[in-house]
Amino acid sequence: MKIEGVLIPLITPFKDGKVDLASYEKLIRHYSKKGVAGFMPLATTGETPTLSDYEYQSILEKTVECNELNLPIYVGFGGNNTEKMTKDIKMLDKYNIKGILSVCPYYNRPDQRGIYEHFKRISESTSLDIVLYNIPYRTGRNIENDTIRRLSELDNIVGVKDACGDFTQTTELLLNRPDNFSILTGEDAFFYSTLMLGGDGGIMASAHLNTEKYVEVFNKSKQNDYKSALEIWKQVANMIPLLFEEPNPAPIKYCLSKTGVIASEALRLPLVPISENLKEKLNKFL
């Protein structure tokens, strides 16, 4: 079954230096009512590199516990130590999750053969579904489309979060897509364009806000009503650049705290709260 729709890469709320599980529970219940297709906790937007192993597991447990609609959960699980990942992934077996979102190995700068072998080893180490995560500006390496197509032939590699930043590359992948393989944009500003070319949806940090509008854009596109989808898209697209004007997820956390969805906009270093200038800009949209 293909993954499609709007999936939320959940933020991790903090308060007084600790993970705010009360706000996190509120967050999950909030988005469960918005028509989203699933949750992706503990990824980039979740500030995962700043979490302890205990916090990581606590957040995962809370996600599963509060997922009353039994929406698919794909947990962020990536790294650049393949051998360690093949062992650590066993820890996920005890949770009721659908799969993992796994970023291209970073810092080591593997070539395409190394990238393929890395994900092949991960796929052989788990029965969970795997969604590839291609975000070269963070990892230093691009997963080329031919590599994605090769990886799609492995049974449990079921899709890609495409944040390559190059719409020419995205277009080529969509036009020459593997069978039964989901292509989900991670470039928020490309959401409508990706749907127009037959994409399956998006995993977008900006969908924390105006969530129903994102879902409407997807639903109208599925009905081939691209004109209506575009009109709805125009209502939210202008806010997207502001949400990435300063490092993600700081602007989103500010908006969620300002509107009462979470208790605090706190982040963990090296990330810091947004500037007063950006707050003024965002307040006009809230």
UniProtKB/Swiss-Prot annotation:
Q: Report the source organism.
A: Clostridium acetobutylicum (strain ATCC 824 / DSM 792 / JCM 1419 / IAM 19013 / LMG 5710 / NBRC 13948 / NRRL B-527 / VKM B-1787 / 2291 / W)
Question: By which gene is this protein encoded?
Answer: dapA2
Describe the task this protein carries out.
Catalyzes the condensation of (S)-aspartate-beta-semialdehyde [(S)-ASA] and pyruvate to 4-hydroxy-tetrahydrodipicolinate (HTPA).
Instruction: Name the Gene Ontology molecular function terms of this record.
Output: 4-hydroxy-tetrahydrodipicolinate synthase activity
**Which UniProt keywords are given for this protein, alphabetically ordered?**
Amino-acid biosynthesis, Cytoplasm, Diaminopimelate biosynthesis, Lyase, Lysine biosynthesis, Schiff base
The entry's protein name is: 4-hydroxy-tetrahydrodipicolinate synthase 2
User: Which superkingdom heads the taxonomic lineage of this protein's source?
Assistant: Bacteria
**Reactions it catalyzes:** L-aspartate 4-semialdehyde + pyruvate = (2S,4S)-4-hydroxy-2,3,4,5-tetrahydrodipicolinate + H2O + H(+)
Q: What is its main location?
A: cytoplasm
Q: In which pathway does it act?
A: Amino-acid biosynthesis; L-lysine biosynthesis via DAP pathway; (S)-tetrahydrodipicolinate from L-aspartate: step 3/4
Subunit structure and binding partners: Homotetramer; dimer of dimers.
Q: Where is this site: Part of a proton relay during catalysis?
A: 44, 107
